[in-house]
């Protein structure tokens, strides 16, 4: 039986976005809107939410606009280490990769982890060896080179202010979708935090923290100060409050983001529930976000 509601919501990260020029905002809006329209058409034609979130996130990974894939920021040793995760609410299948340096689309490899292995999370060299064994695209690290991100790293090193490093973590990408079969899926991908220690892993590849999907309840993708999002299992907590406290999607997600603010944690999240209601709360200067459902027209916002 077809689900009456369906749709998708995406984000391009939360953080200090007030320095984006009008031209930069327009370029980002164009990319997000084009991706949303293409993703929505897949849903409209009966495509699966899992395929849709993988598609949307891989589109953002291929763009230098975001802190994921090609646009990933640098560690303190001037290398890029990427994390990603994806989850299906149908049976809670989930896959993730962390600290990969040569994977063109970490989100695609994350999906392969649960489809082709008995594991959920593969890290570093092991993840890249797995990618080679299944023919997943491996690229030279030069593919990810970014003069802009190197300048950000050197600026961060000169400041040596932890709060600044956290605020600079913008651009993480994510997508959450509900399809016509009622299946909810979520996906998140990031380059992490500028000037992070090599090997540091945040919330993005941690199921329940950066990504969560649960049919008949909701799906969530988060962005922000990963250590706090891990401690409070933010993505799953949104769905838990809906399930056990009978909160609405908006109440649950907004309350959690405000609670994080009270303890000094910055960030935001995107979420969709079983009725295609959407919530996009954040406690930062801005969060790049957009959505489209069969009940609402395409929407894009930063602030």
Where are the model-predicted features located?
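Alpha/propeptide regions of enzymes that mature by internal proteolysis
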Residues: 1-303
């Amino acid at each position: 039986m077809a689900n009456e509601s369906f749709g998708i919501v995406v984000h391009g990260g939360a953080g200090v976005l007030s320095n984006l020029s009008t031209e930069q905002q327009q370029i980002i809006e164009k990319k997000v809107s084009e991706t949303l329209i293409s993703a929505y058409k897949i849903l409209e034609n009966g495509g699966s939410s899992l395929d849709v979130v993988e598609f949307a996130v891989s589109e953002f990974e291929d763009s230098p606009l975001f802190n994921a894939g090609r646009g990933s920021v640098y560690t303190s040793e001037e290398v890029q280490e990427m994390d990603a995760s994806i989850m299906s609410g149908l049976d809670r299948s989930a896959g993730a990769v962390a600290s990969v340096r040569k994977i063109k689309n970490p989100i695609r490899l994350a999906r392969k982890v649960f489809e082709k292995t008995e594991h959920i999370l593969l890290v570093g060299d092991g993840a890249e060896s797995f990618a080679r064994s299944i023919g997943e695209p491996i690229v030279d690290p030069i593919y990810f080179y970014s003069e802009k991100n190197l300048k950000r790293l050197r600026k961060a090193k000169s400041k040596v202010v932890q709060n600044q490093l956290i605020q600079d973590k913008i651009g993480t990408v994510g997508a959450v979708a509900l399809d016509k079969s009622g299946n909810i899926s979520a996906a998140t991908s990031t380059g992490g935090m500028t000037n992070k220690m090599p090997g540091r892993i945040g919330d993005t590849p941690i199921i329940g923290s950066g990504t969560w999907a649960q049919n008949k309840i909701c799906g969530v993708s988060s962005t922000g100060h990963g250590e706090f999002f891990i401690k409070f299992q933010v993505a799953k907590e949104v769905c838990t409050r809906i399930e056990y406290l009978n909160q609405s999607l908006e109440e649950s997600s907004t309350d959690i983001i405000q609670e994080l603010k009270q303890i000094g944690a910055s960030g935001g999240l995107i979420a969709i529930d079983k009725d295609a209601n959407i919530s996009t709360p954040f406690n930062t200067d801005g969060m790049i976000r957009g959505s489209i459902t069969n009940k609402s027209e395409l929407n894009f916002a930063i602030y």
